[in-house]
Amino acid sequence: MSYLRPSLVMLILLTLITGIAYPLLTTGLSQLLFSGAANGSLLYQGDKVVGSALIGQNFTKPEYFWGRPSATADSAYNAMASAGSNLAATNPALDKAIAERAAQLRQANPAMKGPIPVDLLTASGSGLDPQISLAAAQYQLARVAAARQLAPEQITKLIDESTDQATPNFMGESVVNVLKLNLALDALK
């Protein structure tokens, strides 16, 4: 019985600290210091939320840049089903999926004769990547420029503005946020 009171006091104290004080402190600090990120890095078109800079979206029209293939099975970029494809490099299903994606990309981008950037052929670990490499954006440049009847130089400028530079440079490659780029293209209308 002598242990009951200190145990209850400790339970109440730790519940207040870890269940109320700590969450309120971290939420308050994140809202104060990083409000955009704390609220999901939402992107707007006018007053309407159109997505998050952290989650890819499925673009298939020729006038838009396409992101990485999604590994989510039921529907593309379904965050509830986020997972990698888990196909081994020797799996025939992976070879078939890559061949189908390559054929689709070659058909959609007939002006491009070189190799297709790997991030346009393979799904990411999460299946939800919002970015593509600069090479993947440049691979699609001619198709998007023709579909929108814009000068390639004008779109190249938008690609540069939508590029997140690797910091520091040796920590990876620069990437292009596909949703930001497509929103910038829509803003040109």
UniProtKB/Swiss-Prot annotation:
- What InterPro entries does this protein map onto? KdpC
One term under GO cellular component: plasma membrane
| Alphabetized GO MF terms | ATP binding; P-type potassium transmembrane transporter activity
Listed transmembrane segments? 8-28
Can you state the subunit structure given in the record?
Answer: The system is composed of three essential subunits: KdpA, KdpB and KdpC.
User: According to its UniProt entry, what is the function of this protein?
Assistant: Part of the high-affinity ATP-driven potassium transport (or Kdp) system, which catalyzes the hydrolysis of ATP coupled with the electrogenic transport of potassium into the cytoplasm. This subunit acts as a catalytic chaperone that increases the ATP-binding affinity of the ATP-hydrolyzing subunit KdpB by the formation of a transient KdpB/KdpC/ATP ternary complex.
Q: Which HAMAP family match?
A: KdpC
| Name the record gives this protein | Potassium-transporting ATPase KdpC subunit
